[in-house]
């Protein structure tokens, strides 16, 4: 059985997903494409030779009779509108982050999906599909290091563009840790604080960089995340879990160890897409397979909502310098883990 997919948004990630569905993954075919830049959408379809119909209107694509599932990879502020339209049409929808640009927007999607009565939404948080994070979670869940007490994490980028602002360290960068660490611990956050160390001379004038985000979970686990987006040396993701009886670390990406000229070295990646490229394939294949099975199990609209609420608290903490509470309603049974 082949799942007919419509893709809204043909920017970089949209093009990547179209290629995945068309040439790398199984059980899916891109039959419809839309973008606000209609000529770009036509060019993508022609360049890839996929024969998909190009729609000028995203809502027409969503409601097209031959489109069975939707991928939303358009500009972030449009996500809520298109996801709600997909739910109304009763069609499964994979939405790249953010699910919506506000916590209330995410809650609107949660409410619409629960009213529909069936999970239709998967959010594009890819790290739970990364082999390294899955291995780390397996160690935690096995009890081999006892209960997790502390996590020491880092999210480092070589550099960022002029448009990158201080709050984007939360909304664009930390958001991945917000999601994956909650999944890793099977826990939710109750407070956030942000500390600004000495500013790097390499940071843009308007940007506070690095930042340290301190999170506390409902079970009492303490998490510190260093966000440093001008580290210069590469793209580097670190996660160390300190348990009662041992420590577990996220494995480094596989690379050749080089002994040469009196040095022992390993390559460090520079592009985030290279670091998690396999996870992108796995998450989208999971969505395709889950739609075929009639039951979505990946990151949910509830996960998107809780990430947005947590991010809002972190941004508030950036401004206040205080420990900000993170207040979440109880997770509905509708979103209980499968």
Swiss-Prot record:
A Pfam short name: GFO_IDH_MocA
BP terms from Gene Ontology: inositol catabolic process
Transmembrane segments: none
Enzyme Commission number: 1.1.1.18
Keyword set, alphabetical order: NAD, Oxidoreductase
Cited function: Involved in the oxidation of myo-inositol (MI) to 2-keto-myo-inositol (2KMI or 2-inosose).
Record-stated family: Belongs to the Gfo/Idh/MocA family.
Record's protein name: Inositol 2-dehydrogenase
Gene: iolG
């Amino acid at each position: 059985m082949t799942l007919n997919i419509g893709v809204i948004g043909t920017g970089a990630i949209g093009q990547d997903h179209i290629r995945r569905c068309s040439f790398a993954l199984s059980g899916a075919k891109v039959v419809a494409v839309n973008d606000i830049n209609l000529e770009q959408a036509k060019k993508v379809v022609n360049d890839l030779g996929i024969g998909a119909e190009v729609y000028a209107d995203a809502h027409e694509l969503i409601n097209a009779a031959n489109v069975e599932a939707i991928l939303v990879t358009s500009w972030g502020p449009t996500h809520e509108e298109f996801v709600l339209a997909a739910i109304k049409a009763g069609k499964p929808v994979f939405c790249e982050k953010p699910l919506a640009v506000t916590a209330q927007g995410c809650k609107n999607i949660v409410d619409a999906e629960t009213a529909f009565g069936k999970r239709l939404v998967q959010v594009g948080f890819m790290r739970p599909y990364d082999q390294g994070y899955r291995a780390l979670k397996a160690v935690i869940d096995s009890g081999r290091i006892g209960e997790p007490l502390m996590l020491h994490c880092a999210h480092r980028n070589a550099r960022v563009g002029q448009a990158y602002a201080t709050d984007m360290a939360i909304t664009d960068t930390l958001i991945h840790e917000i999601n994956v660490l909650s999944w890793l611990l099977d826990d939710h956050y109750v407070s956030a604080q942000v500390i600004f160390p000495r500013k790097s001379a390499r940071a843009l004038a308007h940007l506070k960089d690095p930042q340290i985000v301190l999170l506390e979970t409902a079970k009492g686990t303490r998490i510190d995340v260093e966000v440093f987006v001008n580290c210069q040396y590469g793209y580097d993701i670190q996660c160390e879990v300190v348990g009662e009886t041992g420590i577990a670390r996220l494995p480094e990406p596989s690379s050749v160890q080089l002994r040469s000229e009196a040095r022992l070295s390993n390559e460090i990646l520079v592009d985030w897409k290279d670091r998690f490229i396999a996870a992108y394939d796995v998450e989208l294949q999971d969505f395709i397979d889950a739609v075929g099975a009639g039951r979505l199990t990946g990151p949910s609209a509830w996960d998107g909502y809780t990430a947005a609420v947590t991010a809002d608290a972190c941004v508030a903490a950036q401004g206040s310098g205080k420990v900000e509470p993170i207040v979440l309603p109880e997770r509905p049974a509708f979103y209980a883990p499968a």
